[in-house]
Amino acid sequence: MSNTTTTATTTNINENKVREIYKAPMKIGEIEYIPYQGESQIQDLMSLIEKELPEPYSIFTYRFFLNQWPELCFLAYCNGQLIGVIISKKQTHKLLERGYIGMIVVDKTFRRQKIGSTLIKLTIEKMIEMKCDEVVLETIFTNIQAISLYENLGFTRIKRLFRYYTMGADAVRLLLPLNDKFLIK
């Protein structure tokens, strides 16, 4: 096999991998959902998260998630304006592959339009492709709307975390099993 053929094959494999990770944008009504594309989007997503979430995150936290698991970040745009984002990761936890949703935000003016649930569903689909056994997230214990959203998507409350957030608020941890590894046989 010549070097030219080897290079072409390697290039095709790499291009296919990129296409698999970064699927084409999906549009529902006026809302366009796109995978994270790179560093040029960090400032906008940081601004949205800082505006909507009470918990402060450093640039290092964003880069930790986005550089290692870019395929687990999705953004929602309306007419070119970033209005929603979800940032997640995958890790091994007690012999299971765990998907972890670290941050999810929808601009207040765009809530109650199923944008958050669409971002979560996109992420869960990707986590299933990545062979995750479960999905876990935390939210402020008093955030009834968010808890209701997660429970409507199949998540179950599993733990209360006292004084979990830096501002002293309690959190609730929720879990969504993705396969039957949780069943006692």
From Swiss-Prot:
Residues covered by the N-acetyltransferase domain: 31-179
CDD domains found in the cross-reference section: NAT_SF
Enzyme class: transferase
EC code: 2.3.1.-
Stated family: Belongs to the acetyltransferase family. MAK3 subfamily.
GO molecular function, one term: protein-N-terminal amino-acid acetyltransferase activity
Keyword Acyltransferase: yes
Keywords (A to Z) from UniProt: Acyltransferase, Transferase
InterPro entries: Acyl_CoA_acyltransferase (IPR016181), GNAT_dom (IPR000182), NAA30-like (IPR044542)
Segments traversing the membrane: none
Superkingdom of origin organism: Eukaryota
SUPFAM superfamilies tied to this protein: Acyl-CoA N-acyltransferases (Nat)
The keyword Transferase appears for this protein: yes
Gene Ontology cellular-component annotations: NatC complex
Cited function: Probable catalytic component of a complex displaying alpha (N-terminal) acetyltransferase activity.
Pfam families: Acetyltransf_1
Protein name: N-alpha-acetyltransferase 30
